[in-house]
Amino acid sequence: IYAGSLVNPELLTGTRKDCEIYNSAKMTLEEVLEVMRQASAEGKEVVRLHTGEPSIYGAVREQMDALDALGISYDSCPGVSACFGAASSLNLEYTLPEVSQSLIITRMAGRTGVPERESIESFAAHQASMAIYLSTGMLRELSKRLIAGGYSGDTPAALVYKATWKEEQDFICTVETLAETAEKHGIKKTALVIVGDVVRHGSYARSKLYDPDFTTEFRIGTGEAKSRREE
């Protein structure tokens, strides 16, 4: 049972000929659960194939609760969310020393609401790295709210279409040109927005972990080693 609107169909090419395949994009939760229940009763193995990392915008909790109620056991497998696939494509580090040590994963409110305390403005006020999902159709509003929250209009941003797919397209822009960039390249959905100075990674501090003067559990820093010799 795969999320047909998001899962790359190439992932289904390795299935056995007798495998029953269901596209959950055309199904309700109840229909998905009935397929699972029936298959379990028949002793079959079921794969519920989500996109990216299921724990992020995957609507998996309601499925797990229902399976628990039915007494059907299951295992969860971790995946790679779009924000991490995009970081790999763009060679980004979200947590650059003295630039940002936090990554905020969020979305604009659409037909699925967002708690008021989790507004784009409140998150933008932190000036941390942000990965914004499910908001491609609201980029003008997103830009306004990011700027209202504290980001300057020229803050670096990236628009990543279909991260990790063969069709992936990456565009570096700014907070104020997100909508313009999407329109120019015909991007209307299935894109991730990344915001923050880490996108351009122009100025940051060297990490302490590999600094020769820094002592860790595994090695003594040069400064401390010199001090010990003097003692």
Describe the role of every protein-language-model region:
Residues 5-8, 20-30, 80-82, 101-102, ...:
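Short, acidic/turn-prone active-site loops that include or flank metal/cofactor-
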